[in-house]
Every structure is written in C-alpha cells, then in structure tokens.
C-alpha cells in the first residue's frame, strides 16, 4: 500500500490521516497519529523575516511573543508540546535552472551567458535554503473527552485539533511576526519527510512539479511508502540513511543564559553539501504538576537556608541563585504563566563520501561557539535525527504511556 508510511526506528508507529476540508481553500490537513506514544500532531510550514537586523527592543518583543504562545498553549490544557524545527539545506539551484530555461533568449550575447552561468555556479555552492516547521502535539488522554463532545471518532479529534490550530496560528501570525503559516497536507508532509532523509532528492521533485504544470499526468507526489529511506543503520556514533550520514547532539542552555539568535552558528554549514538542522522543543507542564514542582522546590530552598543558618554555614552564590529562581517560579505561576522545560537537538548531515566524524566535530565546535554545551546522542542517533530533522512531532521527553 503506497499510502502506508514505511519509516524506520521510532517513526514506525506513525500513521498519517487526511483531515476533513479546512479553511477557505478546503485543504485536507495531514493529521499525524503516533500509535506508540498515543498522540496526535499537526505540522505547519512557516516563514519568518528573521531577527538579524532587529534591535534589542524588537528582540525582546519577539521573546515576549514566544512566552505568550506557550501561555496560550498551556491554557488550552490540551497541547503537550510545541516544536520549532529549522533546516538549512544546501542550495541545489533547481528553481533557478527552471526559470533560466523558461526565460532564455536564443539571441542572447555569448559573454552574458558565460557570466551568468559562472555566477550561478559560484552562488549556488555558497547559498543555503532555510526550511522552518512548527509542530503541535496533543496526547490522546487530553483530547478524548472533548473529542467525544465534538462528535467522537476521528472527525471529533480533527475538530478539536482544528480549534487548536486556529489559536496557535493567530499567535504565530500576530505577535511572533510570521509572514506565512501553511498547515501541511499529506503530500506536502511526505515531501518534507523524504527531503529530510535524502536532501539530494529535492531537485528531481521540483522538476517534476514544474512538468506537472504543463502535463497533469505527471506524478510529482511522494508516496508515503517511499517517504522513508531505502535502508537505515543506527551505529554507535552516527546514523546512516540511504547515501547520507548524520550526527546528532543535544544542547544545554548555560546558567548565565544567551542572547536571542545565539543558535545561528549551529545552522551555518562549513562546506558545500553539508546540511544543518535543529529542533527546539517546549514540553508544557500541566498546571497541577507545575504547582507541585514549584512548591517542592521552594520548600527545599527554605529548608536549605534554614539549615545553613542553624549550622552557621554561609550560603553559596549558587544556592542563593537556585532559591531565588524557585521563588520567582512560584510567583510567575501565580500570575498565570506556564511552566516549560525546553531542550534542543542539532544534527549535521553529509553524503557518505564525506567523513562524518569530521563534520560531527565541527558541529560540536559550532555549538560551543554559540555558547552552549553539546552532548552527543550516542546509541540514540536515530532518535535524535528523527526529532531534529523529520517534522512528525518526535519527542525525547515523552514516554510511551503518555
């Protein structure tokens, strides 16, 4: 069956459904059901103008907008996790080649042809494309009751997911400044998964899409049975898929914090043909669990300070910072904020003809240069790759009985 996903590793339990017609264009959004984790997810392709030329006040506003997005997701009491995925893919020049072939003039000057060809060749090797995805994950346990009130079954769950999509999209387009938010259909999601496993296949797919505009009989879609790799091998230090190797590492936020945009060096490839990708996940802790954790942390901080005073010991700076953080967390929860414990995973992908160990060391160096501490996901490289490269809502913190 070409509609059944054939994906390796942790993605084996994923099933893709076509949701009911949605929006003004009546698109059938792809609904991702993970039978192993018992979750539902939807993925959107987004476009953001970036913050490279923004001043401090503008960046602070974007930070507040992200916090507002997490608060909105937490108040729904349904969204379990929000994942932001970015992939910087080497430019293959497929769109430019198609445009040049359509607009080429037979009487063009020969020198102009040579200059443009040389410029295209040089700029293509030095350019990258950025793909950004946002995925919201909803556990079955949180949506089952409300889905029953909305009609029950698969359609009831889709109605609840569509309501959540509307709330999240309003935050993305408004305070966060996204210029485009497009919820992916099943063929579009299959294309994103296929180019995640094999970045080199994109040029052929783009050409097929161009030919389909002239000849509707051309099949430019990627079946889900072919969206995964033809072969995958999870070794100790890297992950092999088709003719590509990948190395994944988690990143830990330093105690002193970092400036917004500090992840940029991680996304900068060091050589032509190298792809970088990372995902920043925001698992949202339920309000009751957050209150319990905050109360325990504040009680532990008060107990530690009391013991130090009774024994005549001096409270260290690290202990004072942790106590201040615990009390500040309780105050923020009392004001209605949500508690999240974000984490990030970054991945580098290169062809098998290039040494993956060398590019893994370069990835670690980029992480340290950005101000973070890298931790290789040895023995779990396949999970790290799926979480940071394939936009299907794979998480590193969610258990199978969630």
What is the predicted function of each stretch?
Residues 1-402:
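Extended, folded cores of ATP/NTP-driven motor/assembly subunits in large transport
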């Amino acid at each position: 069956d070409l509609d059944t996903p054939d994906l390796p590793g942790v993605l084996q339990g994923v099933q893709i459904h076509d949701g009911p017609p949605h929006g003004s264009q009546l698109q059938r959004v792809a609904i991702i059901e993970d039978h192993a984790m018992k979750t539902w997810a939807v993925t959107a392709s987004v476009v953001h103008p970036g913050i490279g030329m923004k001043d401090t006040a503008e960046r602070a506003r974007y930070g507040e907008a992200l916090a507002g997005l997490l608060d909105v997701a937490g108040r729904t009491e349904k969204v379990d996790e929000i994942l932001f995925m970015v992939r910087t893919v080497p430019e293959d020049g497929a769109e430019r080649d198609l445009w040049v072939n359509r607009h080429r003039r037979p009487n063009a000057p020969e020198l102009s042809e040579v200059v443009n060809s040389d410029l295209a060749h040089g700029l293509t090797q030095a350019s990258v494309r950025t793909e950004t995805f946002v995925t919201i994950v909803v556990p079955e346990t949180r949506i089952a009751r409300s889905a029953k009130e909305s009609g029950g079954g698969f359609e009831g769950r889709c109605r609840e997911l569509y309501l959540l999509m509307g709330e999240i999209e309003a935050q993305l387009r408004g305070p966060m400044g996204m210029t485009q938010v497009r919820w992916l259909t099943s063929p579009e999601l299959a294309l994103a998964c296929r180019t995640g496993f094999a970045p080199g296949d994109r040029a052929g797919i783009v050409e097929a899409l161009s030919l389909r505009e002239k000849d509707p009989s051309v099949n430019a879609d990627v079946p889900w049975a072919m969206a995964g790799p033809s072969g995958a091998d999870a070794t100790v230090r890297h992950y092999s898929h088709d003719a590509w190797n990948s190395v994944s590492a988690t990143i830990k936020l330093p105690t002193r914090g970092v400036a917004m945009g500090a992840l940029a060096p991680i996304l900068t490839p060091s050589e032509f043909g190298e792809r970088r990708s990372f995902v920043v996940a925001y698992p949202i802790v339920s309000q009751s669990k957050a209150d319990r954790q905050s109360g325990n942390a504040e009680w532990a901080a008060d107990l530690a300070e009391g013991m130090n005073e009774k024994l005549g010991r001096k409270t260290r700076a690290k202990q004072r910072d942790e106590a201040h953080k615990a009390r500040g967390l309780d105050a923020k929860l009392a004001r209605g904020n949500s508690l999240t414990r974000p984490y990030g995973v970054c991945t580098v992908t290169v062809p098998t003809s290039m040494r993956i160990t060398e590019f893994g060391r370069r990835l670690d160096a980029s992480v340290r240069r950005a101000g973070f501490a890298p931790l290789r996901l040895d023995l779990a490289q396949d999970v790290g790759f799926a979480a940071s490269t394939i936009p299907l809502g794979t998480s590193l913190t969610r258990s199978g009985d969630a």
